[in-house]
Amino acid sequence: MELLKEILQIYMERREWFLELFGQHLKIAGIAIVLAGIMGLLFGIFIAEKEFMAPVILTLANIFYTIPSISLLGILIPFTGIGDKTAIIALTLYGLMPMIRNTYTGICGVSQEIIQAARGMGSTDIQILWRIKLPLALGVILAGVRNMVVMTLSVTAIAAFIGAGG
């Protein structure tokens, strides 16, 4: 119990410093989450519509995801330097896999009967994507967003090893 009191006392004494680090952590993670979310959604839609590209893009996303985070940060340092930029690039690369895979899986899981019915009513491919496929795939896509956000927030702490804030 005494240890807990000492830890709380340190947090209270250095409150501004900890809040500044917390803000830096959220900024780095937030930028990476937005970038990975947008890019992952676009790549997922692309490979769902162009099936022949799915193995290539999914393999690349899986490769980035399997590299240990501290190693990926080390690999990027010679190219992007030390700091927030390197951390954001690495976190974005990590966040792509859950987004790409879940977007692809969600869109490919839409029933072909529903798509054919929409085509029969005169819908264009863009209308089918925006009005049929994406709304029906939204649950799976949001599960990917959740996984990506949790993973990105947790890995962001490791970015401090390469001089990134937080």
Question: Each predicted region: which residue ranges?
Answer:
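Cytoplasmic-entry segments and transmembrane alpha-helices of multi-pass inner-membrane transporters
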Residues: 43-76, 91, 101-105, 116
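Membrane-embedded alpha-helices of multi-pass transport/permease systems
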Residues: 38-43, 86-115, 145-153, 157
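Transmembrane alpha-helix signature in integral membrane proteins
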Residues: 18-46
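Loop-to-helix entry region at the N-terminal start of transmembrane alpha-helices
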Residues: 20, 24-28, 77-98, 138
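Glycine-rich helix-loop "coupling/hinge" segments at transmembrane-helix boundaries
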Residues: 77-78, 155-166
